[in-house]
Amino acid sequence: MNEQGLSEREIFSYLENAKSEDTDYYRVFSSMCTRPHKIAIEANRLFIEANLGDLGLFAGAHKLEQEVVRMLGNLLHASSIDVPSGGLCQSSVCGYLTTGGTESNIQAVRGMKNLVTAGKKEFKGTPNIVIPASAHFSFDKVADMMGIEVRRASLDSEFRVDMASVEKLINENTIGLVGIAGNTEFGQIDPIDKLSEVALENELFLHVDAAFGGFVIPFLEKPQPFDFKVPGVTSIAIDPHKMGLSTIPSGALLFRSPSFLDSLKVSTPYLTTKSQFTLTGTRSGASAAATCAVMKYLGYEGYRKNVQYCMELTSKIVEEARKLGFEPLIEPVMNVVALKVPNPDLVRERLLKKFGWNVSITRTPRALRLVLMPHNSPEDIELFLEDLKKVTAEIKSP
């Protein structure tokens, strides 16, 4: 830090230089985030100083959070929904806004562990959860932070969790299962209804990570079951800052039962509320305002159009890639495509270095991963495929 402050002009010149080093979304096919909607940006600015970590001081921002959770509950077929005020949850389903999927996943598993421990279940070994091999890396953080064993079930030929593998991994120390509704690499949806049956049969919790798919699946022509309509689902993570078009950070975690939030509570004697159940103390009221604004502005119709646009882009890139001889690993379920190309790691490297395209790679099998988002356009796809054709031709004939 300087001894004396810089001028406003100097500061913004410095910031603009830093901004110029960021990647413009124009050539990004690798991210599950996108440009926030303009109304979300304006709402964020209006509540920039609001702290949801001290609800009594920011009652207006808290009302917006409650409204967001209510709307998300309706979207995810919760019969009734509530955000606790002063640590009390009044209705059957509770939730709050998080920083994103990682925090939501951590808190969901923390709730599982706390409830099982409160029930005085005795373990013969380390408590464990069973997750798909395709699950997000946030569950590695769960294992590290909470001393929980993470057991990874194998995937079937369509990259969904294999139910036989799940059942084989369950033992007397298992506290819960995890299903993914829109996995990061393939956009695939696990059979949540089947996981629900197994969870209920074994008296286990079932958390659904719908961080990406939560704002996609409900608006598909033929949505698969994944939410609170499925009886065994006990918690859901959903990220408005992805396909919900809100500002970053905007995530959400919903629980079927208020007992989950009760298990997460800690005393906060020096705040305006007596207890707190969130992982972070200070929380952004601006994110609540941004999410509330964009959800009310777009409504179901707006989100349906958003998903339809992204699915049209998905169909276009698959169709045009096939003409070049590149097949998808699976027929896309949502707006994520994994293309089979020769030497995908080298293709990715050259696409970035020569043409500035940002794509990513799936782990197993190796393939070119593309996420078709609202910031992409049909023209982007045409340019990208032209460059992909050039790069693969160079690799075949060095």
Swiss-Prot record:
Residue list for modification N6-(pyridoxal phosphate)lysine: K242
Pfam families per record: Pyridoxal_deC
Protein's job: Catalyzes the decarboxylation of L-tyrosine to produce tyramine for methanofuran biosynthesis. Can also catalyze the decarboxylation of L-aspartate to produce beta-alanine for coenzyme A (CoA) biosynthesis.
Name the UniProt record assigns to this protein: Probable L-tyrosine/L-aspartate decarboxylase
Pathway: Cofactor biosynthesis; methanofuran biosynthesis; Cofactor biosynthesis; coenzyme A biosynthesis
Family listed: Belongs to the group II decarboxylase family. MfnA subfamily.
InterPro entries the record matches: GrpII_AminoAcid_Decarb (IPR050477), MfnA (IPR020931), PyrdxlP-dep_de-COase (IPR002129), PyrdxlP-dep_Trfase (IPR015424), PyrdxlP-dep_Trfase_major (IPR015421), PyrdxlP-dep_Trfase_small (IPR015422)
Annotated keywords: Decarboxylase, Lyase, Pyridoxal phosphate
Catalytic activity: L-tyrosine + H(+) = tyramine + CO2; L-aspartate + H(+) = beta-alanine + CO2
Gene designation: mfnA
GO biological process: carboxylic acid metabolic process; coenzyme A biosynthetic process; methanofuran biosynthetic process
Cofactor: pyridoxal 5'-phosphate
Gene3D superfamilies reported for this sequence: Aspartate Aminotransferase, domain 1 (3.90.1150.10), Type I PLP-dependent aspartate aminotransferase-like (Major domain) (3.40.640.10)
Domain of life: Archaea
E.C. number: 4.1.1.11, 4.1.1.25
Single annotated GO MF: pyridoxal phosphate binding
Keyword presence, Lyase: yes
Organism for this UniProt entry: Methanosarcina mazei (strain ATCC BAA-159 / DSM 3647 / Goe1 / Go1 / JCM 11833 / OCM 88) (Methanosarcina frisia)
